[in-house]
Amino acid sequence: MSRTSRYSSPLHAAARYVTQRLLLKPVAWSSVTMSVEGTERLKGLKPPYVVVANHSSHLDATAIVCAIPWKVGGNLATGAAADYFFTKWHRKVFTALLFNAFPIERSGVRNKKSVAATLLSENVPILLFPEGTRSYTGAMATFKPGAAALSINQGIPVVPVAVVGAHEAMPRGRSWPKPGRPPVRLVFGAPMEAEPGETPVAFSARLAQAVRDLFDPVADEMGILRIDDRPPSVKPGRSRDTLTPGSGADSSTDDNGDAGDSQSIENDDATHSGDDQ
């Protein structure tokens, strides 16, 4: 049995269906007013594929794994920070059970092959947040090219997703959504593939634009700021001068973990050396 066999195990999938769809989803949906759009764009989609989304709340991963049709994403595995979610047994069990989570190293450690690449090669779809950490303001940082590199290297599609209103409902620093069931809208985009000769950086930028294009019309309808109209994400107590020019968000390592971070994925898969994460 391989180290990744549990991610596609029917037994684990059955347990996850109960905990995720029959327990987690009702609790989450009762805390916010959730609407899901664009699932018809996933018709005919088959693993493996990568899901990418903007990231400003711990609601993001929950919304995506609970909203994606089970037939399409029942085995969807969520990347999670190894230095937070996999250091204590209760977090490891929790994230594995609810999110089919796999570890992403944010320390710069490289193994011969990333878990993400291995999962995709075994037809397990994955969820990544290419910004690498949650935004403090809802602004979107530059997408790191790791998810795009995985797509190019393995010749698989990427599904862009916009999570709209999650920052307003449960911003970074809150452990539960605000009272009153604030609205959150999740929009699935059509699967995308790299153009012939397109680099991971260029494809990643195109994926980020696709997320913006999904996000902004919905934000207008909800009466909240568009994704690029928000102030840059700055950790409380830090000056904006510490930001990388043009980054649009804080690129420092998250201090309390994020499910779905792809901060380290863009290493060797992006450079085609085959020695990733």
Q: Model segments located where?
A:
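Alpha-helical membrane-targeting segments
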Residues: 6-33, 87-99, 171-181
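Generic preference for hydrophobic
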Residues: 36, 51, 78-79, 186-188
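Short, flexible loop segments at the rims of nucleotide/cofactor-binding pockets, characterized by
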Residues: 26-32, 103-107, 137
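Catalytic core of membrane glycerolipid acyltransferases/transacylases, capturing the structured
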Residues: 44-107
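A generic local structural motif
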Residues: 21-22, 35-39, 64-66, 113-115, ...
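Short gly/ser/thr-rich secondary-structure transition/capping motifs
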Residues: 30-37, 107-110, 168-170
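Non-catalytic C-terminal accessory region of glycerolipid acyltransferases
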Residues: 2-11, 15, 110-277
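Helix-to-loop junction immediately C-terminal to a conserved catalytic motif
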Residues: 24-55
